[in-house]
């Protein structure tokens, strides 16, 4: 099995800390359908801020499994057009994709991604083609007997200099993982993730900016519990006093409801608390 790409080395703990929490969006709604010939359509709408306008996006996705070609086309209510062309199976382990974004008269971007995977390493490169100063971001991960190490760097092509870099090292056992990262800003993270049993997951991450004198260590702890096959409960607590709770329920096949809240345990009398919900349909 190939190692993950660099951004997925800490995917277990990052998903536990960030995924399926609904407080950040007061309201969210999405519908996904698939036709008989495999074309996927989706409609996503969310309200980024309370009493604010909706942000909406429609998308169509077509994949040809025989040739490895894929096309995804999206259009938002801000008149932003997003296109992704995927080229897989050109050679074993190689995948290329071109991602473009266009808002007429406002902004445009184009990124070419290349990923090459082999049993013991995964390499990836991203070329940003539309900036005044084109950039390249590359990463490499290697794995051996549960140990996964990786490095990432950004290169400013016009200036001919490295703009950023980061390193990560993780150990994966059957039911837990340990990891650490360090970047050029001297921001260091240490994390652990554990599958306690088939119903319970726990994890924590500590972050420190070593560049700042007397820097505090920021700690987050999260847990995920599955009461039954159709529901899940998540909770997250940070050392700053922010407590986040979320509940997700499969109402019926293809229909999922999520609700979440966030409150500051140190400022319970102040109006800083958040509440949000999400409703998803998949057919």
From Swiss-Prot:
Domains as described in the record: Consists mainly of membrane-spanning sided beta-sheets. 19 strands distributed along the entire VDAC protein, have the potential to adopt transmembrane beta pleated sheet structures, which rolled together may form a 'beta-barrel' type structure, possessing pore dimensions.
MF terms (GO), sorted A to Z: ATP binding; phospholipid scramblase activity; porin activity; ubiquinone binding; voltage-gated monoatomic anion channel activity
Family: Belongs to the eukaryotic mitochondrial porin family.
Coiled coil: none
Subcellular location: Mitochondrion outer membrane
Major localization listed first in the record, in broad terms: mitochondrion
Annotated residues for binding of ATP: 11, 19
Protein name: Non-selective voltage-gated ion channel 1
GO cellular component labels: cytoplasm; mitochondrial inner-outer membrane contact site; mitochondrial intermembrane space; mitochondrial outer membrane; mitochondrion; pore complex
Keyword DNA-binding in record: no
Keywords recorded for this protein, A-Z: ATP-binding, Ion transport, Lipid transport, Membrane, Mitochondrion, Mitochondrion outer membrane, Nucleotide-binding, Phosphoprotein, Porin, Transmembrane, Transmembrane beta strand, Transport
Primary role: Non-selective voltage-gated ion channel that mediates the transport of anions and cations through the mitochondrion outer membrane. The channel adopts an open conformation at low or zero membrane potential and a closed conformation at potentials above 30-40 mV. The open state has a weak anion selectivity whereas the closed state is cation-selective. Is the major permeability factor of the mitochondrial outer membrane. Catalyzes the scrambling of phospholipids across the outer mitochondrial membrane; the mechanism is unrelated to channel activity and is capable of translocating both anionic and zwitterionic phospholipids.
Entry-annotated residues carrying Phosphoserine: 109
One record GO biological process: phospholipid translocation
Subunit structure: Homodimer. Interacts with FCJ1. Interacts with AIM5. Interacts.
Sites of Phosphothreonine modification: 117
Keyword Hydrolase: no
């Amino acid at each position: 099995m190939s190692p993950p790409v660099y951004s997925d080395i800490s995917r277990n703990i990052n998903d536990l800390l960030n995924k399926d929490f609904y407080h950040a969006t007061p309201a969210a709604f999405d519908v996904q359908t698939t036709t008989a010939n495999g074309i996927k359509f989706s409609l996503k709408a969310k309200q980024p801020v309370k009493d604010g306008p909706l942000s909406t996006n429609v998308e169509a996705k077509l994949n040809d499994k025989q040739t490895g070609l894929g096309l995804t086309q999206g259009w938002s209510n801000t008149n932003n057009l997003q296109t992704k062309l995927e080229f897989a199976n050109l050679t074993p382990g190689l995948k290329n994709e071109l991602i473009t974004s266009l808002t007429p008269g406002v902004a445009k971007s184009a990124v070419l991604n290349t990923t090459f995977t082999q049993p013991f390493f995964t390499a990836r490169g991203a070329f940003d083609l539309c900036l005044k100063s084109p950039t390249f971001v590359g990463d490499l991960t290697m794995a051996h007997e549960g140990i996964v190490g990786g490095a990432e760097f950004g290169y400013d092509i016009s200036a001919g200099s490295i703009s950023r870099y980061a390193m990560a090292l993780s150990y994966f056992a059957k039911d837990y993982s340990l990891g650490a990262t360090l970047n050029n800003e001297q921001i260091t993270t240490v994390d652990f993730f554990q599958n306690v049993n088939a119903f319970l997951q726990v994890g924590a991450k500590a972050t420190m900016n070593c560049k700042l004198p007397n820097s505090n260590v920021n700690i987050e702890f999260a847990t995920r519990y599955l009461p039954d096959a159709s529901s899940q409960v998540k909770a997250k607590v940070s050392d700053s006093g922010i407590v986040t709770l979320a509940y997700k329920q499969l109402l019926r096949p293809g229909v999922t409801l999520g609700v979440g809240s966030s409150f500051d345990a140190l400022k319970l009398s102040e109006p800083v608390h958040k509440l949000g919900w999400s409703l998803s349909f998949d057919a």
